[in-house]
Amino acid sequence: MTHQTHAYHMVNPSPWPLTGALSALLLTSGLVMWFHYNSTILLSLGLLTNILTMYQWWRDIIREGTYQGHHTPIVQKGLRYGMILFIVSEVFFFAGFFWAFYHSSLVPTHDLGGCWPPTGITPLNPLEVPLLNTSVLLASGVSITWAHHSLMEGNRNHMNQALLITILLGLYFTILQASEYFETSFSISDGIYGSTFFMATGFHGLHVIIGSTFLIVCLLRQLKFHFTSKHHFGFEAAAWYWHFVDVVWLFLYVSIYWWGS
């Protein structure tokens, strides 16, 4: 930063946006191939490309922010605005799923038997695994807040413990959600109920996996002393994202599991 006369980060040319776009193309094309032809070659290639891109892109950002000092207060302010806009876009993404659900459930057509859940669908009991999942995510929201406060106070041990607890709760939620999918009496192809249920809860599960990965990276960085009480936006962004995942699940639980059953 000594050779600059301003506080802004002039990003160097990077191949990762291009490889990220390529991995997204391979992932979506691979999903189509998997769904229609039961072939996982393209999907596996997309996952591998995506993982490699994430690793190397995160590596570059950590190098720029932690070791090269490019993330000045002005740059961090821009990153915060970017993260807020990203979460807002995710809100509208899930709003589409809720719209589809309520559009179909509030005025069920004759094809659905004139009722909701549709005739022939046995919904999951909202007081069993879904309620446990809700408790797990709410507990993880408490632990991530504990981790944030510990970081602000400079308490490394509590920060490490709270962050590890949050990650374990996220993994536990993912396992419970996967086991629930195997126990359902309906599938994604069982009309509008199956489609909206698995699309909404499945994409939320994907966001939990993404958030857990985000937190694992933060834990590894915390163990390497990358975060301080005044310079920790990477963790702060992960915490915001995790709270967003918590809130979305509460709406999913109330709408699809409880009211929709």
Swiss-Prot record:
InterPro entries: Cyt_c/ubiquinol_Oxase_su3, Cyt_c_oxase_su3_dom, Cyt_c_oxidase-like_su3, Cyt_c_oxidase_su3-like_sf, Cyt_c_oxidase_su3_a-hlx. The keyword Translocase applies. Its EC number is 7.1.1.9. One of its GO terms (molecular function) is cytochrome-c oxidase activity. It comes from the Eukaryota. Keywords: Membrane, Mitochondrion, Mitochondrion inner membrane, Translocase, Transmembrane, Transmembrane helix. Residues 2-15, 67-72, 153-155, 224-232 are mitochondrial matrix. Component of the cytochrome c oxidase, the last enzyme in the mitochondrial electron transport chain which drives oxidative phosphorylation. The respiratory chain contains 3 multisubunit complexes succinate dehydrogenase (complex II, CII), ubiquinol-cytochrome c oxidoreductase (cytochrome b-c1 complex, complex III, CIII) and cytochrome c oxidase (complex IV, CIV), that cooperate to transfer electrons derived from NADH and succinate to molecular oxygen, creating an electrochemical gradient over the inner membrane that drives transmembrane transport and the ATP synthase. This is Cytochrome c oxidase subunit 3. It comes from Rattus norvegicus (Rat). The gene is Mt-co3.
